[in-house]
Amino acid sequence: MMIRERIEEKLRAAFQPVFLEVVDESYRHNVPAGSESHFKVVLVSDRFTGERFLNRHRMIYSTLAEELSTTVHALALHTYTIKEWEGLQDTVFASPPCRGAGSIA
């Protein structure tokens, strides 16, 4: 199973999202092809109601602790309640460009 699929599976089980998108953005960074190390996650769930963004991120980090301790280097997290998501009208901001130094030969 690919890392992206494992991330999706764990997040679906933990948060029962109404919307979930996991995008492998590793190609945008200074890593070898096929690294599966940088991901963007858009997660919409009522589990976030009443939670600050920092705690929402901690909830995800806890869920993905194994992946973060091994293969996943970075997560760009976009976490919303259903009400917040409706207010955004399905608009999600793009991840910033890589600021890593050097290049992979």
Curated annotation (Swiss-Prot):
GO MF terms, alphabetically ordered: DNA binding
UniProtKB keywords: Activator, DNA-binding, Repressor, Stress response, Transcription, Transcription regulation
Pfam families for the chain: BolA
Gene Ontology annotations for the cellular component aspect, listed alphabetically: cytosol; iron-sulfur cluster assembly complex
Keyword Iron-sulfur appears in the UniProt entry: no
Family: Belongs to the BolA/IbaG family.
PANTHER family associated with the record: BOLA TRANSCRIPTION REGULATOR, BOLA-LIKE PROTEIN 1
Function: Transcriptional regulator that plays an important role in general stress response. Has many effects on cell morphology, cell growth and cell division. Acts by regulating the transcription of many genes, including dacA (PBP-5), dacC (PBP-6), ampC and mreB. Probably involved in the coordination of genes that adapt the cell physiology in order to enhance cell adaptation and survival under stress conditions. Essential for normal cell morphology in stationary phase and under conditions of starvation.
NCBIfam families per the UniProt record, alphabetical: PRK11628.1
The protein, known as: DNA-binding transcriptional regulator BolA
Source species taxonomy: Bacteria, Pseudomonadati, Pseudomonadota, Gammaproteobacteria, Enterobacterales
